[in-house]
Amino acid sequence: MSSSKDSFGARATIEVGGESIDIFRLEALAKAGLGDVRRLPYSIRVLLENLVRFEDGETVTKADIEAVAKWDPKATPSDEIAFRPSRVLLQDFTGVPAVVDLAAMREQFQKMGGDPSRINPLQPADLVIDHSVQVDSYGLLRSFEQNVELEFERNRERYQFLKWGQKAFQNMQVVPPGTGIVHQVNLEYLARVVFARGADGKTVAYPDSLVGTDSHTTMINGLGVLGWGVGGIEAEAAMLGQPIAMLLPQVVGFRLTGKLPEGATATDAVLTITQMLRERGVVGKFVEFYGAGMESLSLPDRATIANMAPEYGATMGFFPVDAETLAYLRFSGREEKQVARVERVLKEMGLFHTAEAPDPEFTDTLHLDLGDVVPSIAGPKRPQDRIALSESKRAWGRTLEGIKANLKDTAKTSAEVTLDREGEEPVTFELENGAVVIAAITSCTNTSNPAVMISAGLLARNALAKGLEVAPWVKTSLAPGSQVVTEYLEKAGLMDDLEKLRFHLVGYGCTTCIGNSGPLDGPIRDAIVQNDLVVTSALSGNRNFEGRVSPHTRANYLASPPLVVAYALAGTMDIDFAADPIGKDSSGADVYLKDIWPSSKDVTEALREAVTTEQFEKRYAEVFEGPEQWQKVSVPGGDTYAWEDDSTYIRLPPFFDDVQPGEPPAAQDISGARVLALLGDSVTTDHISPAGSIASDSPAARYLKENGVSPRDFNSYGSRRGNHEVMMRGTFANIRLRNLLAPGTEGGVTRHLPDGEQMSIYDASMKYQEEGTPLVVIAGKEYGTGSSRDWAAKGTYLLGVKAVITESYERIHRSNLIGMGVLPLEFTGGQNRESLELTGEEIFSIGGIAEGLEPGKLLTVTTDSGKEFQAKVRLDTPQEVQYYLHGGILQYVLRQMAAS
């Protein structure tokens, strides 16, 4: 910051609360003849301030600043900029491998003759442990304690490693398990909106911004903080001081008018917005919300909408800072001095939105009258597939018919089940197709929003008053994103009502939303498997991809917390809530959803009485202390980690073994490559690198058994991301993956060629590598959609894949592939694997790499069958070319550090 060349004289000193603070005023650019910056979207203005502050004549030049100031909303992105976020945010599933990589870099740097303690985060890094808790116990008052005990039993080694990282690395702090979900903790506590830091004896204030190793980092856009998800590899580079190389994006303006009608929630709004934006197509673009309707949305409503930016495909879903932002900062316990600084600094910078401000210029615009939003769900397997609640029964019927068409002839429509649950009388029931077997109030998307959580509690209270009960086959759970939620539910007396419907607290973490739903009751699971029943889940999460929520639910639906409770009461997806009763009251009369749905007046009154600033202050006063189990975890010392050869959780990865000082080896053309997997459209990072349970017959399970781990202790793929041996065996191991090279199969199966032997993808990869055969993956549209899962790229690399050829990529996965030295290519001219009649049995050669690469270059791909086509290099910036040539971004950083 202090080194800014400040070519446009933007630096100025202001007084805030008796303190002199330096800022960079954007109006100085207008005075310098660069045009009126007020025409720019607020998100672009934040990027502009970042470049002005970091102008060094090398990574950020005067010309770069001029390009952003003169941003053309209609231009195809071509200007590369270097963005430096204020901080980095991590969760433990992605954070453990990030810290493993940093520890491995220290190891290699020491071998190269360097001081390992030089490998250090230069930007503040916050790591929140939230991804490890599983719903093993549910429906009991002690479920929370039991799940915490199991979490520490399974993850003690990982947690010990993270504690070492917190101690060994500067600028890193860890929020312990049992505290909350990363994005909700960020929203309620970590985010500052404006940073102030000393430089050259002066205090410099600037906008808070971040990148995070979780795609839903965008939730913080609801607070007016610029930020998005990146791969763990890119986040590590940002921590080490590397700028984020990006193309100056297009910005789609989303105009909101009106206000939500009675009965509709922020969840319904975000599902509507997700559907609209997916249909429009906003991948790689910023979305910025504006319009009079913004004023009717509370800040938690905005955070819910911003959270699902990955689901609508945008890099961000940005709400500029305004009076509502300031009100939330005060309400959530931020110091008044900080709130005053946010207001004054952003107003001086031209980054504070008011109702009188002119609308910015946008690349494209959409409009939604919030008054048109209706109660909705989304499913059965994509968040953008919104279904109006009034249409849900008919939609379920169509879904069931589609699934049944692919079932075995022996599949049944129902099965009798007897359940003998602890503390309850045995019960026998008929489990039918459409049964809701999981109902989870989960995820930061919705548990950060007091209005929908209070609604769920009031609906539970109203249901109890009518004598309704949850269906016995439903696994219920409540997993809030912060301890504040249970504080206000208890104060409102609603926790008791939820618990009477078996929605007991199971943990403060992601749980079901990321696939940690835990096992179903044995008799229910057996009935599903033995009879091929088509059962469902309802969750207040943000993703419902195939195989993600549970291996036993073939259809999964996103819904607001009160609707999750409603589906638990109904016990089935085969219901029209307007026409069909949800149950019967104590007198035998039908009860409909409208009879128990809470009014907005009741919700508002409960919010006013139950949710207080003191709850935030109390719960976040000890945010870094953690439960007793965390405090007892011992911490090893040393600048380098003491790797254990017999560890099945934390292993020294091979990524840096071949990195030597100096220039990298010359890039080579790819010759004689075989196809490891031939895939269709919308292959998610869950398909490529699942986070959930490890199947007992999988290559990863074989490895764990060979290393003395019993199946009950397998834990999840997500928890084992610190061990490359497990993760490479789990790559392409999702039980719902369909590899067209092995027709008629589901899961991580392929054929080894030319012999045609069918085997696991991992075993085929090892065989190809023994034979010296390079590999490629071929896929369709939207490859790598979903979570910002760096292991989807790391695993691809370790399986020997040199290039991936698709019709299109989701942004983060493309970046991750480059970060691991895997070449992302795209079909051109509307071609695809089908139009080219590629079977996957061909031998591929890709030329034009050795002669030199540049962004967007066309390479020639030839096959032994005589086919030839062009593929576009999806290295989009010169910096990405450099990362690829070095074999990856961290390899590039390591060589840079060795050179200095």
Model-derived segments and their meaning:
Residues 1-900:
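Fe-S-dependent hydro-lyases/dehydratases of central metabolism
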